[in-house]
Amino acid sequence: IKEYIKENNNLKKYDFMFYDLFREKEHILPLREEEMMARLGEVFSVSENTFRILDDVNLKFSNITDEEGNRVELNNSNYSVYIKSKNRRVRKDAFESLYNSYNNFKNTFASLLKGNVKTNFFISNTRKYNSPLEMSLYDDNIDKKLYLSLIEKVNDNLDIMEEYMTLRKDILGLDEVHMYDVYAPLVKGIDKTYSYEDAKELVIKALEPLGEVYINDLKKLFDSNCIDVYNNENKRGGAYSWGCYDTLPYVLLNFEGKFTDVSTIAHELGHSMHSLYSHKYQDYHDSGYPIFLAEIASTVNEIFLNRYCSLNAETKEEKAYYLNNLLENFRTTLVRQTMFAEFELLIHDLEEKGEVLTDEVLCNTYLDLNKKYFGDSVISDDLIKLEWARIPHFYTSFYVYKYATGIAVACKIVSDILDKKEGALDNYMKFLSSGGSDFPLEILKKVGIDIVNDDTIDKALEMFRETLEEFKEITK
């Protein structure tokens, strides 16, 4: 087959697709075994499916009293509202209500996660991979060194977290920071409201460093009638960018005029522009980009937006708000997702060594990690040891690291463009146009980013540190 492909020029454009297909051969089983694996598909999904039923349907949290004295029913959706409350009592009550409920089912959650880990080992051993980690990285042809390097580099810079949490304590006026204080707002939210037209103009202004071609195409997309802007009866919540190969991207928004809505526009249009250029410059079979690359373009736009708003803020308070947005992106994406990635690595290592993944083992492993990542500046309350039980991504193993590498690459792209590094803008446009025409690391190498061996992750951590210093100065 390979010889036939070589001799047939009409098939040349399918080179990568065939190469990617043929390299799977060593992990394909004889027919009877493949049939068995196919029949086991539903069995392999039992842990994840049961987790979702338990977490979404059966798990109930005790009611809490909100800031106005009203009794409210806590759930996974509104927890994020109350854990960010300005009222510390509300934050603590929400934290304890949530994790006490997980504590009641910790043995069940442990059994489900253990089942998922065992499934990973069964599949990876059966298909002759060296480990579940290498099996998960194989599809994107990711070097295991990147996964380990990410964890190592973030670990080497955890003093940033220590500084950030110490500053949090000072700004909030606390004697000590607990886990229920970690999401408390450090600065007052801005009161500005935006019309959709104003929001579009702000996003366009913020993204001007991406050049005339990008901006002109962005304006065309805004004017294309492909964006469903406002909330409406029976409309689903959230936001996303979607479409197919021979159409413009379609974007769903639920715009309400807040800055977070403006940020959502920048984020989703980042995905849309990535799709627009990939569909334009790649054949259909190479036009879809993998998850490893998907969050880069959207995060680039968010960083540019926060940077522009920070530079053009009218007050110190407003500038502090945008800087804090960026800090929280670093903390929750670069650091937190790396902590999750390290937890996954640790529990698979424990399983391989024959350790039984009981609730106690999982809780102790997670609590030790939490203490390491937050340092002495935060009290790692005992209940936080149960956080692993509520993370659905752990049932799609070795996935979350992609969020951390995504923000790291985005930081490098933004820095290079702002520093007017030779070829930086052209390289970014080339990246947006590459789709899935090669493996993710190869696509990045072609545009000057060797994330496995260069300083991409270090630069992101440096940007985190610099943003923290700037935030310190303005909040003195």
Residue ranges of predicted features:
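A well-structured
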Residues: 1-189, 200, 474-476
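C-terminal, non-catalytic "cap/extension" segments appended to globular domains
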Residues: 19-23, 141, 170-180, 265, ...
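Long, K/E/R/D-enriched contiguous segments that form extended
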Residues: 167, 171-219, 223-226, 274, ...
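Short pre-active-site segment immediately N-terminal to the catalytic Zn-binding motif
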Residues: 191-196, 244-266
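Catalytic zinc-binding patch centered on the HExxH motif and its immediate surroundings
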Residues: 192-194, 227-247
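Conserved helix-loop functional segments at active or binding sites
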Residues: 205-216, 242, 271, 275-283, ...
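Post-HEXXH active-site segment of zinc metalloproteases
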Residues: 263-264, 275-299
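An active-site-proximal "capping" alpha-helix that borders the catalytic cofactor pocket
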Residues: 269, 293-306, 406-407
